[in-house]
Amino acid sequence: MEYFKKEVDVAGKKFIVESGKVAKQAGGSCTVRIGETVVLVTVVSLKEPKVGIDFMPLTVDYRERTYAAGKIPGGFFKRETRPRDGEVLVSRLIDRSIRPLFPEYYRNDTQISAVVLSHDGENDSEMAAILGASIALYTSDLPFTTPIASVRIGKINGQLIINPLIAEQKLSDLDLVVSGTEEALTMVEAGARELSEAEMLEALNLAGKTLKGICLFQKTLPAKTKIVVEQPQHNSLLKADIEAEAVSKAEMSVVIKEKCEREFFWDSFKKDISSRLLEKYPEELPSTIDAILEDIFYQKARDLVLNKKIRTDGRGFEEIRPITCETGVLPRVHGSSLFTRGQTQALVTVTLGSPCDMQVIDELIVEYKERFMLHYNFPGFATGEPKRDRAVSRREIGHGNLAKKALKHIMPDGEDFGYAVRIVSDILESNGSSSMASVCGGSLALFNAGVPVKSSCAGVSMGLMKEGGSYVILTDITGMEDHLGDMDFKVAGTRKGITALQMDIKILGLTTEIVAQALEQAKRGRFFILDQMDAVVSAPKNDLSNYAPRMITLTIPQNKIGELIGPGGKNIRKIQEDNNVKIDIEETGRVFISGVESDGVKSAKEYVECLTVEAEVGKIYKSRVTKIMAFGAFAEILPGKEGLIHISQLSNRHTKRVEDVVKEGDEVKVKVIEIDKQGRINLSIKAAL
């Protein structure tokens, strides 16, 4: 592995790339440094291809070592365990960025590892990891001959910013990550605060121009001689025998509108012809016959769309499948909806909780609480397949994150709506675009739950089929169109603009004109879906569900937080137990009181107010005598606040014994006559007469 150390300037920030110093036994490796953030990326691959598979076995792992930020992991074992969701999402970004650049028939098991070794808390490790993956691949002997780069675009005060700092990202109206070669895009992921199509296109154009320079820089790096991947050559006699039967069957299959019926027809034919041909050609593998059959089906399906201008289910290119929307479908949940579009169906629920239900996110740089959560579940029965219910898949994490981005910017501020909100999307049926169904169902369920969201939100998945200079853009693609197409382009948003965007491209040569057309076509589709949703429910319910917790917010002086909590938590524990409520206190003095019963919440609020209110000199209070002493009596005028009634202040007449006037437990009116410098309260009964 040849040593080199070079740097490239990206919008005034230097990326320093070094290779040949560490991890030299890997097929390719490098470190990428920006500021004091350092990422090590390695790539290894088996020398021989896997047999009997029709996909590239690529695994990408992005991990953040806690020592990179000077931290020790929490938990009993004090070491990094399974990847956090954030790490999984970056792994997916890298995978989606580079996968389209591998040869179609490359089948060697390949693993890319990106490890964050140092993080300065300012510079983005994600962009460094994607750049490092490209360099490690490009300088290795793997058949990766076209380098890619990635750039993050933000928008603050109307100005586009290339690779904003982490602090700047929090202020940005746009979080756009774009990967691509010097000529074309390969991956796009974005979350936005209702930006227009024109604004999004402007950001994409800026990203494309920035990528070009980084890709040209990589071409100056020394690279090993590349492995040559040859297209498999099939037995010509076998291929002719298959084509003699399969061409007509494929033409019949691709026009069957129902997914299950089409799959049954084609799978039955495949099983029949495969068994017959394996007897005739015993030296051939079943996977070889499957590959030839799938290629025929692929060509016929694309020919139907590109040349005959007919979609496989008979729809027009911009036609959206039939939509049905229902809300309040589950009786006991806080909010629910059932969104169905064609053969894709999402059951979406909303659960409201108190601030203590917020998710604690322990990231490498910061720890914070997440008020809004969205979880996406994709069981096997959604596609009629058996599937073990194991850990959440990377795909489920990715789809849930996209739907969360789409809905995040319509959520009310925590200042206005203090509840923790959890959305769960259970996919009951799937034939394409289940993540966008989750967005639509999530919006409807939020309305049904009475969450004061800013507007309704919908999403649609777009597809592209391109052959030479000819192409068609499809609205609301099915699973088969996604599989056969050259692009999967998901766009979600409101009537004001885009809130989330995701694009995966399988081909090179995607032009700005195509992207612009796809954005405008997606806008028309989104508006159509919003019309269907608004016809069912156009605004949030005025009231929360009877089963949702009631919440009251109030603010107390910061110096009173200790008094509210009490010694060892005594006061707050008593309030919670007596009123069956939960109380959460922020450092600012903001107090959240939540409970199932409204009366309990109100009672707890009154108690908190009394406990934290200051006694006022000259004010008369109803009090309860708590303790008798020789020199006077102590009385509680407010919860947790006692004052002394000196024996001389018990009555207008001379008092020899305190017990002659008051006894423990008596309720008497008292007046605050003094609060001394130490905060001690002096009371008087005779002054209150």
From Swiss-Prot:
Keywords from UniProt, A to Z, are:
Cytoplasm, Magnesium, Metal-binding, Nucleotidyltransferase, RNA-binding, Transferase
State where Mg(2+) binds: 482, 488
Q: What's one GO MF term for it?
A: polyribonucleotide nucleotidyltransferase activity
Where found?
A: Cytoplasm
> Could you tell me the superkingdom of the organism this chain comes from?
Bacteria
**Enzyme kind, highest EC tier:** transferase
List the record's Gene Ontology CC terms alphabetically.
Answer: cytosol
Q: Which InterPro entries match?
A: ExoRNase_PH_dom1, ExoRNase_PH_dom2, ExoRNase_PH_dom2_sf, KH_dom, KH_dom_type_1, KH_dom_type_1_sf, NA-bd_OB-fold, PNPase
Keyword rRNA-binding applies: no
RNA-binding found in the keyword field? yes
Query: Locate the KH domain: which residues?
Result: 549-608
One GO biological-process annotation of the entry reads: RNA processing
Q: What does this protein do?
A: Involved in mRNA degradation. Catalyzes the phosphorolysis of single-stranded polyribonucleotides processively in the 3'- to 5'-direction.
**Similarity-based family:** Belongs to the polyribonucleotide nucleotidyltransferase family.
Q: What is this protein called?
A: Polyribonucleotide nucleotidyltransferase
Write down the species. Endomicrobium trichonymphae
